[in-house]
Amino acid sequence: VNGIAGIINIFCMTGWWGIYSSKNKQDMLWPDMTWCYILAYDLWNFEYTYNNLPTHSWYCGLALLLAPTFANAFWNKGGWIQNRANTLALWCMFAQVFPLFQDKSRFSVLTSVYADGYMDPTVPPTNADPTMQGVIAIIALVANVCVFASIIKRAKEQKKNPYKNEIFTDQKDYKLALERAAEKARKAA
């Protein structure tokens, strides 16, 4: 289910020719990557970490997804993709340098699958309850299908190729992100 949701999420990335730099040339802006895509991506990526990286699900799966999402929602419109790349890179470097932080320290977190609070890669969990994994997987799949259906509907209504053209141009987030773009980019849009 995770793989299907992930593939659908790739097709939810619209407006590939609408990636701009900000006026001060410090940010990469992708105005068409609005809250619709961000929500679908966050749900899918949390599902991935929750299901496959149990000790990472809190830090990498939730905290790292919320940081760029909050930034995009409140002060960095259009900059979500760059913020996501930065936070992910910082986490990966930290996790490689201090791997025991997430695995064996007092800050380690295990998902409900490991109900007995024990994780050993050589021993399957005896009290495993994968119910939440299935619930999260279905939620992520449904969200990505809904966003993709919305993209198809908008593309047909606007008679646009959603991958070459931006299709969320009527959304407030898109307009605010484009205001941050360099003058040349705004004329092209």
Where are each of the predicted segments found?
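Generic multipass alpha-helical transmembrane bundles of integral membrane proteins
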Residues: 1-78
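C-terminal transmembrane-bundle signature of multipass membrane proteins
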Residues: 60-187
